[in-house]
Amino acid sequence: ALVLIAFAQVLQQCP
């Protein structure tokens, strides 16, 4: 589930 966490972080960075 590491990929999901990384993906969520990238989405959060977006405005």
Swiss-Prot record:
Swiss-Prot/TrEMBL keywords: Blood coagulation cascade activating toxin, Glycoprotein, Hemostasis impairing toxin, Hydrolase, Metal-binding, Metalloprotease, Protease, Prothrombin activator, Toxin
Keyword Glycoprotein on entry: yes
CC cofactor: a divalent metal cation
GO CC term (a single one): extracellular space
Co-factor note (free text): Binds divalent metal cations.
InterPro entries according to UniProt: Serum_albumin_N
Note: The molecular weight was determined to be 72 kDa with an isoelectric point of 6.67.
Function: Snake prothrombin activator that attacks the hemostatic system of prey. This protein is functionally similar to blood coagulation factor Xa. Potent calcium-independent prothrombin activator, possesses high hemorrhagic activity along with metalloproteinase activity. Has considerably stronger activity than FXa.
Protein name: Venom prothrombin activator
